[in-house]
């Protein structure tokens, strides 16, 4: 599998936002949040950090994104998405196996109900270290 990684650009903002919104719609407890405020915050976060995001391509086709950055003495894996039509093809596993090569501790937030993602992270040595809120775990490796 030949994956190509490119720094994301402004033209990617909307696609990343749509993936984020889809995850929020699927896994967030929407009745207990200010939905519009959360979506505005997510969009601004992506827009303000777009050049820290990485676009993942397979055969010149965009298949996903991730935001992996240093946070003090750790690394945070934030916004790791593979488009649904490309899931279960080994892409997420390949990307994750490359990202975990760092010596630093890596942490991430994952929706409690996102069992597929949790299982993937566990296969690569991540463990749930605490519940962040009702809907999210913090996992660490």
How should these model regions be labeled?
Residues 108-119, 134-141:
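Conserved beta-strand-loop-alpha-helix junction that forms the acyl-donor binding cleft
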Residues 2-5:
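Extreme N-terminal starter segment of soluble prokaryotic enzymes
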Residues 96, 102-113:
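Conserved GNAT acetyl-CoA-binding A-motif
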Residues 89, 93, 139-141:
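Accessory recognition modules or surfaces
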Residues 7-13, 17-79, 83-85, 96-98, ...:
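Acetyl-CoA-dependent GNAT
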Residues 93, 113-131:
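Conserved active-site alpha-helix within GNAT-family acetyltransferase domains
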Residues 83-85, 89, 112-113:
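Active-site acidic-Proline motif in GNAT/NAT acetyltransferases
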Residues 85, 102, 124:
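Conserved dinucleotide-binding and phosphotransfer motif residues
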